[in-house]
Regions:
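Long, highly charged amphipathic alpha-helices
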Residues: 436-440, 536, 684
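Long, contiguous domain-sized segments
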Residues: 2-295, 318-319, 446-533, 539-878
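Long, charge-dense tracts
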Residues: 272-531
Length: 878
């Protein structure tokens, strides 16, 4: 077995200090005459408000994709650097026509008295040469790198182009890449192209490819920008798509990639991909819902190009033909929950029924044969190849981070307070799931059942805790919510009405209880075309003083027809003492634990000897539209957990037991409505949570960075944060403003603040693997130190991550590996930013890392430390 490394390397790249990457670019401003006419025409539309900006998103995507010479288009037409192109520059005739088409379709879609084609003349676009340093940056007063705007808007495209031109090798051979669709935030991908075809008798044929996405990030108080290059997959079904689930209250939407092998406007132009949005909107002519292009890139491009443009309806009814025929190929970007036609794709009657939105009787879940994720070997190879290819321009690897403490450092074990008593209701539809839950209590939790002789629906379990279990019939509670024909109410309205119905049916609980409800998952309701009732059920149960946990139906164990013959591998067997699968019992146990967690069944633990006895405080800011919901949870080693919510008018609210938090949130408490007073109320609430001016006891506050990325507590942002120099919430730290009041640890005795930042959907934190992976195990876990105050915590590999380490997806000769699911623990950035004198930053980073694995309700390590994890879980009641 390979040794475990003590060195971790992040997969992001950095730049060599003061090494320029100068490129000569052609730069053009937006013609003032065009801009004045466009603004005037746009604001003459009655539905457009005076302060609304021009809808430039489609224009940015269109111009960037039409001419591969263009590397950036600003979303602000008033910018002096509106278009940036490579020499010898872009085709002004194409650009002028594109602006005219965009103005016609998006600025004045109903027509106006301006002839945009006559107004937008190529001679109005004036390009001039400008030398731009792509690696230009400076260092802020707090020591954090501040990249120039071109690092975020231009550099990713140049890096992606570098990969395409160099045919970046992977798997020991040069590969063909194409520029991915441009993105509004400046990110750009290099995509392996064409995609690979996978054949599957179960899921149908499909396409899959890998891509590397470039973006620039910073690390607090670190003087160099980091270049992230994230490896991921893109999947495209070839089976007819009958149904795409809606996300939110609007109609179903989808992303379609477009590729013109011979160019969108001119033959032999360099290849690039475009991404267009489609939605299933009501068609007045046919009186049915059909797939249509959303206003934006697709509608403008269809107006502009001379090539036959894809019909979005055909992209869904016959994806294989759309991806293989025509001058413009279209690829539906796979979305979980989509529904497919299981019959023959040549069945014209079936296809017509799908196009009309009718039930066909053959639709089933559309499973893509390819699974997401890559093994560590793939991430490391992409990282090493990029570092070698980009070294000539001054971009290379980061130095390894050293492990903090011992590799086998003792885990903080949670302890259970003995003698606790709870009431648990089991709402089941089948006797099978009910028996699985009772078996989990007896066999997995080692509790002793004692039936109530007076009531057959009540069973008391005794042991480490006392549990009164009440059996309930769920009936049709979990059957799903129907949407009547022609009903266009928002989904939120239907969920709200159903929550009221359920609350009325189940009635008020006589006291605080936990509940488990047998319920299918979201994919099931997508298949049967009903609305998933889970959000409504959570609120209805909470309002009646029940904390709800949902559980999918249990399964009996069935012996395999062909058991494994290996003597080293145990044959499959049911969970000991039961007839159920191991997975069913473990899922039932997890549901029990999480239901009890909501009743306040939380762990206690001893504070490490190196730290004082600390109160642990989590601060989280939820947002719902314009409404803010700040939540504070306090875990006191010597007392019960408490929660704090804000009031709508700013009046302080008394603390409430953690177990009462679900009911409070479900009944609408804790909301701060939008308006001029909102930011001040949020700031006062957060300041009170810190204990300013009245608390002196030892406490550590955990705060999530992304909760305050744009507002609420500017000091937590990378560009403002500074060790042990605290600035209160609610103060806008504009670079031009005077420095506000700064507080030192001596002024606030006992207070510590730890900021954490997760990888999240924006990939703000890079992945991390063993730096010396050639001689040690490539996977790594523990706490690693990046700088004096910045650490990275990596959880151990979970039991579900069983994909062999050698299952590469970057070898085109082994496509079967794409069918494997791969995942790797993601580093959590930990920054002990405000500490008391003589505190050791590593000790508080170690505490934060250990609190990711200190629970009674789950054996899985969580993304956040316990106080923040509990705050995050409250989201299900909002």
């Amino acid at each position: 077995m390979p040794a475990i490394s003590n060195l971790m390397r992040l997969t992001s790249l950095t730049i060599t200090p003061h090494t320029p990457w100068n490129v000569d670019c052609q730069v053009a401003p937006f013609p003032p005459r065009w801009l004045a006419a466009l603004r005037d025409a746009y604001h003459r539309r009655p539905e457009i408000k005076p302060d609304w900006s021009l809808p430039t998103r489609g224009l940015v995507e269109l111009l960037t994709g039409l001419d591969p010479a263009i590397v950036n288009v600003s979303s602000n037409p008033a910018s002096g650097r509106f278009i940036v192109a490579l020499p010898p520059g872009a085709d002004t005739t194409v650009l002028a026509a594109a602006v005219a088409a965009w103005a016609t379709t998006e600025v004045t879609p109903e027509g106006c008295d301006t002839d945009w084609w006559a107004l937008c003349q190529p001679c109005d676009l004036h390009f001039h040469t400008e030398t731009i340093n792509l690696l230009d940056y400076h260092v802020r007063p707090n020591g954090t790198a501040a990249g120039a705007s071109q690092m975020f808007t231009l550099l990713p495209s140049f890096l992606a182009q570098h990969v395409v031109t160099a045919k970046l090798p992977l798997g020991g051979r040069a590969r063909d890449w194409i520029l991915g669709p441009p993105q509004r935030d400046g990110r750009r991908s290099a995509v392996l192209w064409p995609p690979e075809r996978l054949e599957s008798a179960r899921a149908g044929d499909a396409l899959v490819t890998a891509k590397i996405t470039f973006h620039v990030e910073t690390v607090p108080n670190h003087p160099l920008p980091h270049v992230h290059a994230d490896l991921s997959t893109s999947r495209f079904p070839l089976m007819p798509v009958a149904y795409v689930p809606a996300r939110g209250d609007g109609p179903p939407q989808a992303t379609i990639w477009l590729h013109a092998p011979d160019g969108f406007l001119r033959e032999h132009e360099p290849h690039t991909l475009l991404a267009a949005a489609a939605w299933r909107a009501f068609d007045r002519a046919s009186r049915t819902r059909q797939w249509q292009w959303k206003p934006g890139l697709a509608t403008t491009l269809a107006w502009l190009t001379h090539l036959p443009f894809p019909n979005p309806e055909k992209v869904f009814t016959d994806p294989a033909a759309a991806a293989d025929e025509g001058k413009i190929r279209a690829y539906y970007l796979y979305s979980e929950g989509s529904k497919s036609l299981a019959g023959d794709i040549d069945d014209l009657d079936e296809l017509a029924a799908i196009a009309a939105g009718e039930e066909t009787g053959k639709a089933r879940t559309l499973l893509h044969p390819a699974n997401t994720g890559f093994v560590p070997k793939d991430h490391i190879e992409a990282h090493e190849q990029l570092a070698a290819a980009l070294a000539p321009v001054g971009i290379g690897m980061l130095e390894p981070c050293e492990r903090v403490g011992k590799r086998n450092q003792r885990k903080v074990k949670p302890a259970e307070t003995p003698g606790q008593s709870y009431t648990l209701e089991l709402w089941t539809q089948s006797a099978l799931t009910r028996e699985a839950l009772l078996a989990a209590l007896e066999q997995h939790h080692q509790l002793t059942p004692v039936p109530d002789p007076a009531d057959p629906t009540v069973i008391t379990f005794t042991g480490e805790l006392n549990l009164r279990v009440i059996l309930k019939d769920a009936g049709a509670l979990g059957a799903g919510i129907d949407r009547p024909d022609g009903d266009r109410q928002p989904e939120a309205t239907l969920l709200g009405a159903y929550a009221n119905q359920v609350a009325q049916r189940i009635g008020q609980s006589p006291g605080p209880r936990a509940a488990i409800l047998e319920l299918e998952d979201g994919r099931y309701f997508s298949r049967i075309r009903k609305i998933d009732p889970k959000p409504a059920l959570k609120k209805a149960f909470a309002r009646t003083d029940r904390r709800l946990q949902c559980l999918r139906p249990a399964k009996l164990f069935t012996p395999p027809a062909n058991p494994p013959k290996s003597a080293r591998k145990k044959p499959p067997a049911p969970y000991p003492g039961t007839g159920f699968t191991v997975g069913s019992i473990l899922r039932a146990s997890a549901a029990i634990n999480d239901a009890l967690r909501q009743l306040g069944h939380l762990s206690t633990y001893e504070t490490p000897d190196t730290l004082p006895d600390l109160e642990h405080i989590g601060i989280w800011l939820h947002r719902s539209g314009n409404t803010c919901i700040p939540i504070v949870i306090r875990l006191n080693p010597s007392g019960p957990a408490t929660a704090y919510l804000a009031s709508a008018d700013g009046t302080p609210m008394p603390p409430l037991p953690y177990s009462d938090l679900p009911k409070a949130l479900a009944t609408g408490k804790g909301r701060i409505p939008g308006g001029k007073n909102q930011e001040g109320q949020v700031a006062r609430f957060l300041t009170n949570a810190l204990g300013v001016g009245h608390d002196t006891h030892d406490r550590v506050v955990f705060v999530r960075s992304s909760s305050f990325r744009t507002r609420g507590w500017d000091w937590l942002q990378d560009k403002h944060i500074y060790p042990d120099r605290l600035i209160l919430p609610g103060i806008e730290l504009d670079d031009a403003t005077a420095t506000p009041r700064v507080f030192s640890p001596q002024e606030w005795p006992g207070l510590r603040i730890v900021r954490v930042r997760e990888r999240s959907g924006t990939d703000e934190v890079a992945r991390g693997f063993a730096a010396d992976h050639e001689t040690t195990s490539v996977r790594i876990s523990g706490l690693f130190q990046f700088s004096d105050r910045v650490f990275y915590s990596i959880n151990p590999r979970s039991d579900q991550m069983q994909t062999p380490l050698g299952a590469t997806k970057l070898d085109p000769d082994i496509l079967s590996n794409f069918t494997r699911q791969a995942a790797n623990p993601r580093p959590l950035e930990i920054y002990p930013v405000f500490l008391q004198p003589k505190d050791d930053p590593a000790a508080y980073a170690t505490l934060a890392s250990g609190l990711r694995r200190t629970y009674l309700h789950t054996e899985q390590a969580t993304v956040f430390p316990a106080p923040l994890h509990l705050c995050e879980l409250a989201d299900e009641y909002l």
